[in-house]
């Protein structure tokens, strides 16, 4: 019978119908939960899409910048990424604040110079040190040059080469001459040079220069060569070594032999007096 189809059949056990009803109810409940979950998920997505965007400030990004100063602002904060996705126009305003850049690179104000990188204050200190070393080297060179000049001067004084140019006068001549003693190395060359300066036919000297130069140094000619020393005394040329003569001469004079002989006699008398005084003592 059709009316008895809802009930248990003769061949089926009595619990089969109850189990079928429970399966139908559980499937219906699962469908309702699935629909409810889908509806809730769509509502959450709608709420997230319609959520208002907020502009980030330096306070929001400061902790992230302190943790990783080399990382960019967009990667250090997830909220910044969400805001950048929502509004592109407002993103650069929040990420380019001066406080953020200063907090991300605290040592950028010192500056880096050259390669390998050297900070500015270190470069200045190295430059000042090099400048001081250069000035010290120049001072040492100047002191060395001054000491060398002083040594050369002292050596020249010791060698007797400080006389240089001296005046030469001749009896009977109004105008005098000058001669460089450093250009000569002996009395002979000096006498020859002076004879060539003052030679005249009236002097009565021989024509030979060698003979004239020798006669100026002895008492056989009309004129005799004398000099004034540092003490102001007039002396005959040729009595002392050449180096001593050059170091002590002040000026030269070609004196007449008569006057020069008196000078020589006086000089010899002084030496005799000194020798006798030493013998008595």
Swiss-Prot record:
Annotated Gene3D superfamilies: Phosphatidylinositol 3-kinase Catalytic Subunit, Chain A, domain 1
Disulfide bonds: none
Positions occupied by motif EAR-like (transcriptional repression): 36-40
Entries under InterPro entries matching the protein: AUX/IAA_dom (IPR033389), AUX_IAA (IPR003311), PB1-like (IPR053793)
Induction: By auxin.
Biased composition (Basic and acidic residues): 133-157
GO biological process assignments: auxin-activated signaling pathway; regulation of DNA-templated transcription
Protein transport as UniProt keyword: no
GO cellular component, one term: nucleus
Residue ranges of every copy of the PB1 domain listed in the record: 163-259
Biased composition regions of type Acidic residues, renumbered to the chain: 18-35
Known tissue expression: Highly expressed in flowers. Expressed in shoots.
Sequence segments annotated as region (Disordered): 1-115, 130-157
Xref: Pfam families: AUX_IAA
Biased composition (Low complexity): 7-17, 36-49, 63-84
Subcellular locations according to the entry: Nucleus
Keywords recorded for this protein, A-Z: Auxin signaling pathway, Nucleus, Repressor, Transcription, Transcription regulation
Family membership noted in the UniProt record: Belongs to the Aux/IAA family.
Functional note: Aux/IAA proteins are short-lived transcriptional factors that function as repressors of early auxin response genes at low auxin concentrations.
Record text on subunit structure and interactions: Homodimers and heterodimers.
The protein's name: Auxin-responsive protein IAA10
Source organism per UniProt: Oryza sativa subsp. indica
